[in-house]
């Protein structure tokens, strides 16, 4: 939960730096080293390329996938059963678009966004679907917040990266 902790103290920039880091210890080191599962720790191989004494199929660092879904993908919950959603993607500039959906008992939640450049401005566009019998708090990267009910919503705001 390191990435969540960094976000809670206002250091989303540091969370993204850690996410993108490919030196060990990091998540991308595992990918660059050929990993297709989560390892028990981030230092799976020593400097000579020999595997350490650990599990190469272990969820110890799996919280990164959840963080990506909630922070990059923008879909989170504010109440049990996804009856009150939090739609709050937090782009870092390296990722220019995301499309996520999640099936709940009330229906499918959709959060799709992209960043385009227009006249030297970065325009963040969001499309989201809030299922029936559900409410959502939509938090845009420019700081504006919208409390909405079921429906389909589109927003465009200028952001700095």
Give each language-model segment a name:
Residues 2-3:
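Conserved small-residue packing positions in alpha-helical repeats and bundles
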Residues 13-161:
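Non-catalytic C-terminal accessory modules of carbohydrate-active enzymes
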């Amino acid at each position: 939960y390191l990435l969540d902790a960094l976000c809670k103290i206002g250091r989303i920039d540091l969370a993204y730096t850690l996410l993108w880091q490919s030196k060990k210890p990091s998540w991308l080191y595992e990918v660059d080293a050929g990993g297709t599962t989560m390892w028990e720790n981030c230092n799976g191989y020593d400097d000579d390329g020999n595997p350490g004494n650990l599990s190469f199929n272990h969820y110890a660092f799996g919280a990164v996938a959840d963080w990506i879904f909630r922070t990059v993908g923008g879909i989170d919950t504010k109440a049990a059963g996804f009856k009150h959603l939090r739609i709050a993607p937090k782009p870092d500039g390296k990722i220019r678009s995301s499309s996520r959906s999640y099936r709940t008992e009330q229906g499918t939640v959709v959060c799709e966004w992209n960043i385009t450049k227009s006249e030297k401005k970065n325009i963040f566009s969001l499309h989201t679907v809030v299922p029936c019998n559900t409410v959502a708090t939509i938090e845009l990267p420019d700081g504006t917040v919208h409390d909405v009910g079921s429906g389909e919503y589109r927003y465009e705001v200028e952001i700095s990266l």
